[in-house]
Amino acid sequence: MRQYTRRNVLKMLGVGAVTVVGLGLVGCSGAGEGGAASSASEPVPASQAFAQAGVWMQYDGDEQIGKDVEIERILSFDGNGNVAVYQCNGATFGDLNGLSNEQIIELAKELDRAVFEAEKQAAIESADEAIQAWQQCYDALKAEADAGTYDSMNNYGAYGIEGVPEEERAAAIEEFQIALENTKSSLDAANEGQAFNEAAEYQEPQPQPYTLALETDGSGNVAAGEEIRFPARRFSFYQIEVDDTTDLESPETRFRVLADYGWHNDAEIPENVFSAPEDSIGLYSFNYSTTQAVYDTTFGGYSGLATVVEEGHAGFTWDTTDAEGVEVD
């Protein structure tokens, strides 16, 4: 996956070095766009934090936020109970310094598209390699069958139809033809899958409803954990590969691979490029959440999920069991 330097990020946003200086204060106070969640004298419950329009960054919760810590996804809350989730492998917290919420969202869109294009290209290249190997294999076997020589056949210690006893040749040829037909059918399926990959077009993620779920302790009265659940979009491409193309290229192994193991293309063509299974993020550090400055920007939140806050922010906490709109076990 491509790594994005701060210069790359600024180019993607069309922001020059001089402009960044002017935005330096926006990074520190830009969270003011998100309302009270950015400046709080008391810890903010999750239901209040996510109910406001704002941008949150998901990262590895085992790491301390820092300029080189990678951001896995960016979550954009619309203030109406919905969240749009962007994949952004390669960006870091340092890349967000001085950016407003709007600019972070624009960056998220560019990064999400980049992830899509990278996965699409990887799927196309992998399938293309497999298709080329199998096509060459099929062409070679077809030429042998058309010539009546069946040179790749080696069931009796010698290659070709001449090595097969006369009384068993019909059965051997039938076996060869079955392998050839199966190869052609699977090759056709692979080409269809590749066409699916090539036709795939990027679409921006749309805001989807999220829910907050609270887990209680043995008494049922005290919060013991909380998580946010949401549909997390995935990119689905046709995936197929050949483990060892040399087996299909060699006349000594080509037919054996097809006849003994068969080539069954079990890879399925996805119904849609985009799927959205439910995902969740645990909201840890319930008593308090530390804040961390990166350059001129201060981040705070839960372990693994952070937003831009003002210096001195009191942090974020779990909801109580009577919080409105929160599912309780």
Per-segment meaning from a language model:
Residues 1-16:
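N-terminal secretory signal peptides and thylakoid transit peptides that target proteins
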Residues 24-27:
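C-terminal motif of bacterial Sec signal peptides marking the signal peptidase cleavage site
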Residues 29-37:
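Bacterial lipoprotein signal-peptidase II cleavage site
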Residues 40-70:
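Tryptophan-anchored aromatic micro-motifs
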Residues 64-164, 169-240, 244:
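N-terminal glycine/threonine-rich, aromatic-flanked beta-hairpin/loop signature
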Residues 184, 195, 200-202, 207, ...:
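A eukaryote-biased sequence property
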Residues 228-291:
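Mature extracytoplasmic/lumenal regions of exported proteins
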Residues 269-329:
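Edge beta-strand at a domain terminus
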